[in-house]
Regions:
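Rossmann-like dinucleotide-binding cores of NAD(P)H-dependent redox enzymes
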Residues: 1, 55, 80-127
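Feature captures the FAD/FMN-dependent oxidoreductase FAD-binding
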Residues: 1-38, 127-139, 144-147, 168-172, ...
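Generic hydrophobic/aromatic pocket-lining and core-packing "Φ" positions
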Residues: 12, 80-81, 223
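FAD-site-proximal beta/loop scaffold in flavoenzymes
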Residues: 41-64, 149-220
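Rossmann-like NAD(P)H-binding beta-loop-alpha module
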Residues: 59-89
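Cofactor-binding loop segments of dinucleotide-utilizing enzymes, especially the Rossmann-like FAD-
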Residues: 72, 95-98, 215
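Mid-to-C-terminal Rossmann-like scaffold of FAD/NAD(P)H-dependent oxidoreductases
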Residues: 110-116, 121-136, 144-146, 239-246
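A conserved FAD-binding loop/helix module that cradles the flavin
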Residues: 216-244
């Protein structure tokens, strides 16, 4: 059934009443993380997922001549390549860690560089500057790597007195994605990072009969990992239904 918003048009209680005995949550991570710096609401600043979605839907996009992409994942490299293909004269990715810590797949990074995308490592934005309501530049600071953080990567630390400005007319924000889980009933527990908690063996959530998999559980990952989670959950759901006599 299409055109249905779970949590608005129907909820889990309604699904149980309709006779469903198991639910699988696979909503992905389609909510963009927000960059909490000044100037994020200027014209010419767009989230990478919104940008890629619009391009994929065939919408006409106004592409700047000089584009900066902020982030270091596969979405950042996809957005950078897309902007270049759509006519941008110069596209630069700003990433706050080193090449070794970059979460994007190595081949994605190589493809972007081969197509002409420039990558500046150990650089973070401090402020997005604008003129007449439109982005005109990004004030940046150079970083150095410190001790390992909770992600297992070395923590980027701003270098005092290293601020500089990059002029551009478009900023694409690709600093991460998260699942939109506002529709979930309170009985379903979340992990510390805001994803759905599941039993790693059965993929069942804290609510009996409800399973989950893919990016909604792991955070942004690969299609292969999502397919694997789906297969694992399907087996568990089958076993669960058999236990009910279904």
């Amino acid at each position: 059934k299409t055109g249905v918003t779970v949590g608005k048009d129907l909820n889990f209680s309604g699904l149980w009443k309709e006779g469903y005995t198991s639910i699988f949550i696979a909503v992905g991570t389609h909510k963009s993380q927000k960059l909490k710096i000044e100037g994020g609401d200027l014209k010419g600043v767009i989230h990478a997922l919104d940008f890629l979605w619009s391009v994929n839907c065939g919408e006409k996009m106004e592409i700047g001549k000089t584009v900066v992409v902020i982030g270091g994942g596969n979405v950042a490299t996809d957005a950078a390549k897309t902007a270049l293909r759509l006519g941008a004269e110069k596209v630069t990715i700003l990433y706050r860690r080193s090449r070794e810590e970059m979460p994007a797949n190595p081949w994605e990074v190589k493809e972007a560089e081969d197509e002409g995308v420039k990558i500046e490592f150990l650089v973070a934005p401090k402020k997005i500057l604008g003129e007449n309501g439109r982005v005109s530049a990004v004030e940046c600071v150079r970083m150095q790597l410190g001790e390992l953080d909770e992600s297992g990567r070395r923590k980027p630390i701003p270098m005092e007195g290293s601020e500089f400005t990059r002029e551009m007319d478009m900023v694409i924000l690709a600093i991460g994605e998260a699942p939109d889980l506002e529709f979930l009933p309170k009985e379903i527990e979340l992990s510390e990072d805001g994803t759905v908690w599941v039993n790693p063996i059965t993929m069942e959530t804290s609510l009996q009969g409800v399973f989950a998999g893919g990016d909604a559980v792991t955070g942004p990952a690969s299609v292969i990992e999502a397919i694997r989670a789906g297969k694992c959950a399907a087996e568990s759901i089958e076993n669960y239904l058999k236990s009910l006599g279904g």
